[in-house]
Design a protein with these regions (language model features):
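Phosphate/NTP-binding elements of NTP-utilizing enzymes
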Residues: 1-219
């Protein structure tokens, strides 16, 4: 949540946790309001997120979800996840099916050190690098066109048509893509600072530093 604050999303103004948004905020109603707001993150645009815990069985069985955000994946029970939560990622195709992220997943974690916690590493073999490269190429082209428009203050008919084509291509490719990447904390050096990396190397056990900070698989 501190990152949301840093990015300009403030609690009580842009999102709330565990309570129904008061009408005085003027936020739109969710398409499907939750029956219980206790485990709900609500946003100022009317969207909501449901916080799911694996402490109890069946907490996601009755849900119809549009997207999954799985944090600290190395601590997740994969058997419970695939039996309960994956099947719940099924809702509202008629409403949001045109969006390429619909029914997608974001999985983030430190590098696991146990076999049980390594379930998500298997996605690496399903990452089609040629598809990812094609997406990257289109993104670069889109950026270049938009940058030229910004610099010149003029948008040609070709640029307008090409941006539309790129948008359609990207939506189609992204809807089929699985992106897998392992990043060390060095990639986030502008936020963390080099002193943090040095301190972690000094203070953490070697295995913890290699897996949690440098994102290296245990040998």
């Amino acid at each position: 949540l501190q990152h949301w604050e840093r990015w300009g999303f403030h609690r009580g103004k842009h999102y709330l946790i565990g309570i129904k948004p008061p009408k005085k905020l003027g936020w739109p109603e969710p398409v499907i309001p939750p029956s219980n707001w206790e485990n709900t993150i609500s946003f100022y645009n009317g969207s909501i997120g449901t916080i799911i815990s694996q402490d109890r069985k069946g907490t996601s069985n009755s849900l119809s979800l549009d997207y999954l955000d799985i944090d600290e994946a190395k601590f997740i029970n994969f058997e419970q996840l695939k039996d309960e939560t994956f099947p719940a990622n099924r809702g509202n195709v008629n409403l949001f099916g045109r969006h390429y992220y619909h029914h997608g997943m974001l999985i983030t974690s430190d590098m696991p050190v146990t076999k049980k916690g390594s379930w998500f590493l298997n996605y690496k073999k399903d990452c089609d690098q040629q598809l990812i490269d094609a997406i990257s190429s289109l993104v670069v082209e889109e950026y270049d066109i938009r940058n030229r428009i910004k610099t010149s203050g003029h948008i040609s008919l070709y640029a307008k048509r090409r941006l539309k084509e790129i948008g359609l291509h990207l939506a189609q490719l992204r809807s089929k893509a699985l992106f897998y990447k392992e990043y060390s904390s060095v990639y986030n050096i502008e936020v963390l600072g080099m002193d943090f990396i040095k301190q972690m190397k000094r203070d953490l056990p070697a295995l913890t530093f290699q897996t949690s900070i440098m994102c290296k698989r245990p040998s």
